[in-house]
């Protein structure tokens, strides 16, 4: 699967179902802890530096951001979870918004859950993965920040994350670095069966 980086647009930033775009395209949602690198991952996958706004400050994405990727699929950037400085009310609001999208959106075909390769999955990572499995949503786990781990230890970290998430044997786990930028094609190939 190839995408044209010049044919990508943010369609809408939505907070409720009525605002979701009316389209036939399959959707791939990106979920993960605040600051796990969702926006950086999107930018690196589509070969554009600033399409998805990145921030050093966790918890910046507060809406469901729908990106039309070359008329082939839609990436949906979901607000990050597990950010302590967000108020309880705000967290509940995000939770409702994410739940409504994940449980009701028929276009949703796959969730890419991003976890930090350097650390054990957090309680929130485990809850999110279990939540997706409860609703039988196909999930691709991507371990970000691969460049921060010595090459010889990457597989050990992947195995640890797989074990702690108690991953479904049908789900795939891949390590990724937005800096090394060398696995986009492998990931597009993993996404492709869900959107065709």
Swiss-Prot record:
Matching CDD domains: YihA_EngB
Protein name: Probable GTP-binding protein EngB
InterPro entries for the chain: G_ENGB_dom (IPR030393), GTP-bd (IPR006073), GTP-bd_ribosome_bio_YsxC (IPR019987), P-loop_NTPase (IPR027417)
GO cellular component terms given for this protein: cytosol
EngB-type G domain ranges (all copies): 24-196
Function statement: Necessary for normal cell division and for the maintenance of normal septation.
Record PROSITE patterns: G_ENGB (PS51706)
Residues that coordinate or bind GTP: 32-39, 59-63, 77-80, 144-147, 176-178
Similarity comment: Belongs to the TRAFAC class TrmE-Era-EngA-EngB-Septin-like GTPase superfamily. EngB GTPase family.
MF terms (GO), sorted A to Z: GTP binding; metal ion binding
NCBIfam families: GTPase_YsxC
Cofactor(s) needed: Mg(2+)
Keywords, in A-Z order: Cell cycle, Cell division, GTP-binding, Magnesium, Metal-binding, Nucleotide-binding, Septation
Species, as recorded: Staphylococcus aureus (strain MW2)
Residues holding Mg(2+): 39, 61
One GO term of the biological process aspect: division septum assembly
């Amino acid at each position: 699967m190839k995408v044209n980086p010049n044919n990508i647009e943010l369609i809408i930033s939505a907070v409720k179902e009525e605002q979701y775009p009316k389209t036939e395209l399959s959707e791939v949602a990106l979920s993960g802890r605040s600051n796990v690198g969702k926006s950086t991952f999107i930018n690196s996958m589509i070969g554009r530096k600033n399409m998805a706004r990145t921030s050093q400050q966790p918890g910046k994405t507060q809406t469901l951001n729908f990106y039309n990727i070359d008329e082939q699929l839609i990436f949906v950037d979901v607000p990050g979870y597990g950010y302590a400085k967000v108020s309880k009310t705000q967290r509940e609001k995000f939770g409702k918004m994410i739940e409504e999208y994940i449980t009701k959106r028929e276009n949703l075909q796959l969730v890419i859950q991003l976890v930090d390769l350097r650390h054990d999955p957090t309680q929130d990572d485990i809850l999110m993965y279990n939540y997706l499995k409860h609703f039988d949503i196909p999930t691709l786990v991507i371990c970000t920040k691969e460049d921060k781990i010595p090459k010889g230890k990457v597989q050990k970290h992947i195995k640890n994350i797989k074990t702690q998430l108690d991953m479904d044997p049908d789900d795939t786990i891949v390590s990724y670095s937005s800096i090394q930028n060398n696995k986009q094609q492998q990931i597009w190939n993993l996404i492709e069966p869900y959107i065709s």
